[in-house]
């Protein structure tokens, strides 16, 4: 439907050569119609984990903000929402205000990948080291939330390492992501097979870049050192199983030269 809209309603067929824009528009169309319903339930302790977020928080891929209702604004100093689909931002801002976030909510038109996120954070005033913040080890955020978003970032391993760098030592990462079915341990081979089938018939393109076969738990473990790594699988007999949990970044000494340049 997205392709038909671009060609016949917008009358901009050359837009099809910009696959990134098509992907965002496809996702925006899907989320506008189904985002609220898809956010009424989440596997495991997803909502409880989000409700405990505090301090300076980065929410990757909040869409139009349906999940913002799960945050407690009284515990949050500043909430940054990194959403690349700009068409979803009016709903995102509206939902943030409804929930009680005002001047402490900052929408960012960017994705979670470093080449998109770092410039946006620099522009917003959070980062004050041009070109260096993405690899710094001191971090900026007390918490980073990834809810059904790492399935769609272009380079998941690079993106996750970048997010790890932005997390303060001792900071928490909240994860609720669908992943490749763990059929070798606790999943089902039939479900894993169907993930392959859906991918071959065009799931990623039709679903706005969403990938069914990512080993996100492994990517997270390899991103850096963790004091706590608590992820559990949910729905392992299904085609779309999830990993849900929290990770605590290993404590380390701060680089004061970098810390002095970080503003929140």
Where are these regions (language model features)?
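C-terminal alpha-helical "lid/dimerization" subdomain adjacent to the S-adenosyl-L-methionine
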Residues: 17-18, 24-36, 176-244
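Conserved alpha-helix/loop element of class I SAM-dependent methyltransferases that forms part
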Residues: 33-56, 64-70
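C-terminal lobe and adjacent flexible extensions of AdoMet/dcAdoMet transferase-like proteins
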Residues: 243-264
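A short SAM/SAH-binding and catalytic strip from SAM-dependent methyltransferases
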Residues: 141-156
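A short glycine-rich, Lys/Arg-flanked "PGG" loop and its adjoining helix->strand segment in the class I
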Residues: 157-169
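A short acidic, Gly/Pro-enriched loop at the edge of an enzyme's catalytic core
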Residues: 117-144
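N-terminal, positively charged/glycine-rich alpha-helical extensions of SAM-dependent methyltransferases
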Residues: 1-31, 36-38, 42-46
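Class I SAM-dependent methyltransferase SAM/SAH-binding core
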Residues: 58-125
């Amino acid at each position: 439907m997205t392709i038909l809209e671009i060609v016949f309603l917008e009358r901009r067929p050359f837009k099809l050569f910009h696959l990134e824009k098509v992907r965002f528009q496809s996702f925006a169309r899907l989320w506008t119609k189904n985002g609220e319903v898809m956010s009424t339930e989440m596997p495991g302790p997803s909502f409880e984990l989000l409700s405990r977020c505090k301090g300076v928080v980065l929410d990757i891929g909040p869409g139009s903000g349906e999940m913002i209702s799960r945050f407690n604004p009284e515990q949050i100093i500043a909430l940054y929402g990194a959403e690349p689909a700009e068409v979803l931002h009016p709903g995102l801002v509206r939902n943030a205000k409804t929930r009680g976030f005002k001047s402490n909510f900052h929408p960012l038109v960017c994705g979670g990948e470093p080449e998109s996120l770092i410039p946006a954070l620099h522009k917003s005033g959070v980062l004050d080291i041009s070109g260096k913040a993405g690899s710094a080890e001191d971090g900026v955020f007390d918490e980073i939330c990834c809810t059904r978003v790492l399935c769609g970032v272009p380079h998941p391993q690079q993106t996750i390492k970048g997010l790890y760098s932005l997390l303060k030592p001792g900071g928490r990462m909240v994860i609720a992501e669908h992943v490749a079915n763990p059929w070798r341990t606790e999943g089902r081979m039939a479900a894993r097979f169907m993930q392959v089938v859906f991918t071959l018939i065009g799931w990623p393109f039709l679903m706005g870049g969403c990938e069914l076969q990512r080993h996100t738990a492994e990517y997270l473990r390899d991103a850096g050192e963790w004091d706590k790594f608590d992820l559990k699988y949910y729905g392992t007999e299904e085609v779309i199983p999830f990993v849900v949990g929290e990770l605590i970044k290993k404590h380390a000494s701060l680089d004061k030269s970098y810390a002095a340049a970080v503003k929140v």
